[in-house]
Design a protein with these regions (language model features):
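Bacterial Sec-dependent N-terminal signal peptides
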Residues: 1-29, 149, 196-200
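Short glycine/proline- and aromatic-enriched beta-strand/turn motifs that initiate or cap beta-hairpins
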Residues: 21-57, 129, 191, 197-200
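Residues on the lipid-exposed face of transmembrane beta-strands in outer-membrane beta-barrel proteins
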Residues: 28-32, 50-58, 70-72, 98-104, ...
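Structural signature of outer-membrane beta-barrel domains
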Residues: 33-37, 73-77, 118-122, 164-169
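Outer-membrane beta-barrel translocator domains and adjoining extracellular loop/strand segments
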Residues: 38-43, 78-85, 123-130, 171-177
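Repeated loop/turn-to-beta-strand initiation elements of outer-membrane beta-barrel proteins
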Residues: 63-66, 108-111, 155-159
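Predominantly the C-terminal beta-signal and adjacent terminal strand-loop region
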Residues: 78-79, 136-137, 145-147, 154-200
């Protein structure tokens, strides 16, 4: 699926969600990510990036609804600078994502859970200020689960925290030793999102 197909799906599904009930909401959000790749041997939430996008939400009742979005997200992993030789190393993965989530509102808080599909738009390695190709390369898609919560700050503005994890390996593990271990079967993106946004 190409990026144009993702955009088409978003534009096609948004009116359908809105048709579920006459009233629907749209919004935008921007923020930062911190991420790691499970199974890459680097460890730690040391890779920082940016994220942002738009969404539409359709209420099913006064407290329940669905939300679909279209987001850009930086993912990957990074080692801290070595204190002896000062080497650095990071995987830099860039995705366009379409999360589809169920939402439940309780006062100023709204809780979200669902699935996402991500399409890779670029990947590389940054080591000691030089870029290299990733080998073996990551798959050009990412499918996983996402959950989070939103705190409404007045009528229009909100802050949001979100966690996502791949459920299908983003690439086979380079060091697959235990066939009975789920996490040794491959690498999995894990991302924390910290966002501010506005409803329209």
């Amino acid at each position: 699926m190409k990026l144009t197909k993702l955009l088409f799906c978003f534009c096609f599904l948004a009116p359908l969600l809105g048709h579920a009930q006459q009233a629907f909401k749209a919004g935008v959000s921007f923020g930062i990510t911190t991420s790691q790749i499970s199974g890459d041997g680097l460890g730690g939430w040391d890779k920082f990036g940016i994220t942002g996008g738009a969404f539409v939400s359709a209420p099913l009742s006064s407290k329940n609804g669905f939300r679909i979005g279209l987001n850009y997200a930086d993912k990957g992993s990074r080692t801290k600078r070595d204190t002896l030789n000062f080497n650095t190393f990071s995987y830099r993965l860039r995705y366009i994502e379409v999360p589809v989530q169920y939402s439940f509102q309780n006062g100023p808080f709204t809780f979200h859970t669902g699935l996402y599909y991500g399409r890779m738009i670029k990947q590389d390695i940054l080591s000691n200020s030089l870029t290299y190709e990733v080998n073996p390369a990551f798959r050009n898609y990412d499918f996983g689960m996402v959950l989070g919560s939103t705190l409404q700050m007045g009528e229009h503005f909100f802050i949001e925290g979100r966690f996502s994890t791949s459920v299908i390996p983003t690439r086979p593990s380079p060091n697959f030793a235990n066939p009975n271990s789920y996490y040794e079967k491959g690498n999995y993106n894990q991302v924390l999102y910290f966002l501010i946004g506005r409803n329209f």
